[in-house]
UniProtKB/Swiss-Prot annotation:
Catalysed conversion reaction: a 3-demethylubiquinol + S-adenosyl-L-methionine = a ubiquinol + S-adenosyl-L-homocysteine + H(+); a 3-(all-trans-polyprenyl)benzene-1,2-diol + S-adenosyl-L-methionine = a 2-methoxy-6-(all-trans-polyprenyl)phenol + S-adenosyl-L-homocysteine + H(+)
Entry keywords, A to Z: Methyltransferase, S-adenosyl-L-methionine, Transferase, Ubiquinone biosynthesis
Encoding gene, per UniProt annotation: ubiG
Function in brief: O-methyltransferase that catalyzes the 2 O-methylation steps in the ubiquinone biosynthetic pathway.
Protein's UniProt name: Ubiquinone biosynthesis O-methyltransferase
NCBIfam families: UbiG
Keyword Methyltransferase among UniProt keywords: yes
GO-annotated molecular function: 2-polyprenyl-6-hydroxyphenol methylase activity; 3-demethylubiquinol 3-O-methyltransferase activity; polyprenyldihydroxybenzoate methyltransferase activity
Organism field: Pseudomonas syringae pv. tomato (strain ATCC BAA-871 / DC3000)
Xref: InterPro entries: SAM-dependent_MTases_sf, UbiG_MeTrfase
Enzyme Commission no: 2.1.1.222, 2.1.1.64
Domain of life of the source: Bacteria
C-alpha cells in the first residue's frame, strides 16, 4: 500500500500554479526558505554534496540548495507541483533533477546514495511519517545527514498554525493542515532513532504577526526542524 494521501496531494495540485508567486499562499515558504537553507548549510556544507529533497513541491528549497553548490534531486507525488518546478528551473537556469516517486520506492532504487536528505513540511501530509523517515535513513550514506521539519502538536500549535495562520492572518489556505497529523518533537525523535538516525540538533521557527517576520529560535512549540545523523 502506497504511503500517499491523495486528498493531501490534491490540495497542492490545485494551488501549484502559484507556487513561485511570493505574494500567494506560498509566501510563508518563500519567507522561511533562506532561514532554513542557512541552517542546513551551516551543518551540512552543501557545496559539492549530493542532496535529496523529499516532498520538494514546486522546488523552492531544491533550487536554493542547488544555488549553494549541491547536486539536487527533488521528489514529490504531486504532478502539478513537479511540472511547476521543472518549468521554473528553465526560467531560473538552476539545475535540479525532479522525479515523481515516493521516498519508499526511491529507497529501494537508490540506497545510500545521498550525502544529505531534506524532508521539510512533508511528514504531516502522509499517512505514515515513520515510513518516510525509514526511507530517508536508507537513502542517506553512512555518516550523512537527514533534516526534517514539521509542526508540533499542542494547543499553541493549533492556535498559531491552524486558527491563526489559516483563519485569522490568512497566511495559508483554510484546510492546509490537519491538527491530528502534527508531530511532537518527542515522536519525531523516537521515529528517527528507531530508523537508525541520531538526533543532533533542533531549532524552532517563530512568526511575529506585527513585523511579519520569521526567525529561528529555541521555541519549538509550533514549527521546528531537526538535524539527524546516520552513523558511519
Amino acid at each position: 500500500m502506497s504511503n500517499v494521501d491523495r486528498a493531501e496531494i490534491a490540495k497542492f495540485e490545485a494551488l501549484a500554479h502559484r507556487w513561485w508567486d511570493r505574494e500567494s499562499e506560498f509566501k510563508p515558504l518563500h519567507d522561511i526558505n533562506p532561514l532554513r537553507v542557512n541552517w542546513i548549510d551551516e551543518r551540512a556544507n552543501l557545496a559539492g554534496k549530493k542532496v535529496l529533497d523529499v516532498g520538494c513541491g514546486g522546488g523552492i528549497l531544491s533550487e536554493a540548495m542547488a544555488l549553494r553548490g549541491a547536486t539536487v534531486t527533488g521528489i514529490d507525488m504531486g504532478e502539478a507541483p513537479l511540472a511547476v518546478a521543472q518549468l521554473h528551473q528553465l526560467e531560473s537556469g538552476v539545475s535540479v533533477e525532479y522525479r515523481q516517486i515516493t521516498a519508499e520506492d526511491l529507497a529501494e532504487e537508490m540506497p545510500e546514495q545521498f550525502d544529505v536528505v531534506t524532508c521539510l513540511e512533508m511528514l504531516e501530509h502522509v499517512p505514515d511519517p515513520s515510513s518516510v523517515i525509514r526511507a530517508c535513513h536508507r537513502m542517506v550514506k553512512p555518516g550523512g545527514q537527514v533534516f526534517f521539519s514539521t509542526i508540533n502538536r499542542n494547543p499553541k500549535a493549533y492556535l498559531f498554525a491552524v486558527v491563526g495562520a489559516e483563519y485569522i492572518l490568512n497566511l495559508l489556505p483554510r484546510g492546509t493542515h490537519d491538527f491530528k497529523k502534527f508531530i511532537r518533537p518527542s515522536e519525531l525523535g523516537a521515529w528517527s532513532r528507531d530508523a537508525g538516525l541520531q538526533v543532533k540538533d533542533i531549532i524552532g521557527l517563530t512568526y511575529n504577526p506585527l513585523t511579519k517576520h520569521y526567525k529561528l529560535a529555541s521555541d519549538v512549540d509550533v514549527n521546528y526542524m531537526i538535524q539527524t545523523l546516520r552513523e558511519a
